[in-house]
């Protein structure tokens, strides 16, 4: 239960930093926000995967916690937070690629940042972490929707009581292949959600590939 609250707090922080990056600031503030976004996203991804791993040992507590969350009217809005954060992160990485600026190398942090920025490691990190945040966000949506229906929306082979691992597997499979693999989608509702996920994943992957091509063509 405690770790789920931590994940929620990280979602909110990540979304807040994502929004703040679009405000007009001096370069140093933008740099701090970029670093914050990367650190929070790392913490979010690691925490989410740890929770998924823990769910295989605490199935009952996971089910109880998910059902409790599903009763909250704001849950659908909360579901959108990591997805929006991932999209805003991708937009930020593209903007940073186009309008990157170096910091005065007066501190060790500035020197390290300029080195990473020069080789576009910052953009690459944001892109990769944003992709994981997007897939995790949809995995949590699949989990909530499926458990609200009594696990009737999705059918996992030889798995009577799916854990969070199953939903992560389903989401990441769609994010990489745009297909549901061996998971059955049983209702129109979940098929609409899968279709939306596939479209967003396709757009995200296309923009990410375009950014990589742009970096290569620029001589990076």
Regions found by a protein language model. Name each.
Residues 96-101, 129-151:
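Transmembrane alpha-helix/helix-exit interface in multi-pass inner-membrane proteins
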Residues 166, 170, 185-220:
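Pore domain of cation channels
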Residues 85-108, 174-189:
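Alpha-helical transmembrane segments and their membrane-interface junctions
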Residues 48-74, 94-108:
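Membrane-helix interface/capping segments
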Residues 45-61, 136-148:
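Membrane-water interface of transmembrane alpha-helices
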Residues 146-188:
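Membrane-proximal soluble regions of multi-pass membrane proteins
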Residues 2-25, 87:
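The first (N-terminal) embedded transmembrane alpha-helix
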Residues 22-47, 118-134:
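Alpha-helical transmembrane segments
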């Amino acid at each position: 239960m405690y770790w789920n609250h931590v994940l929620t707090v990280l979602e909110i922080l990540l979304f807040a930093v994502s929004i703040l990056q679009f405000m007009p600031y001096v370069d140093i503030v933008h740099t701090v926000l970029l670093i914050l976004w990367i650190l929070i996203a790392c913490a979010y991804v690691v925490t989410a995967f740890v929770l998924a791993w823990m769910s295989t040992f605490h199935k009952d507590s996971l089910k109880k916690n998910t059902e409790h969350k599903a009763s909250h009217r704001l849950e659908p809005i909360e579901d959108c937070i990591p997805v929006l954060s991932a999209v805003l992160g991708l937009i930020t990485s593209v903007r940073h690629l186009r309008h990157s600026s170096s910091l005065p190398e007066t501190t060790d942090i500035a020197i390290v940042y300029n080195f990473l920025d020069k080789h576009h490691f910052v953009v690459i990190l944001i892109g990769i972490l944003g992709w994981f945040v997007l897939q995790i966000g949809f995995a949590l949506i699949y989990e909530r929707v499926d458990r609200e229906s009594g696990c009737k929306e999705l059918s996992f082979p030889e798995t009577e009581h799916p854990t969070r691992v199953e939903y992560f597997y389903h989401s990441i499979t769609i994010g990489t292949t745009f297909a549901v693999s061996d998971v059955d989608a049983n209702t129109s509702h979940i098929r609409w959600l899968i279709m939306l996920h596939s479209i967003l994943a396709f757009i995200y992957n296309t923009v990410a590939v375009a950014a990589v091509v742009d970096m290569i063509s620029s001589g990076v």
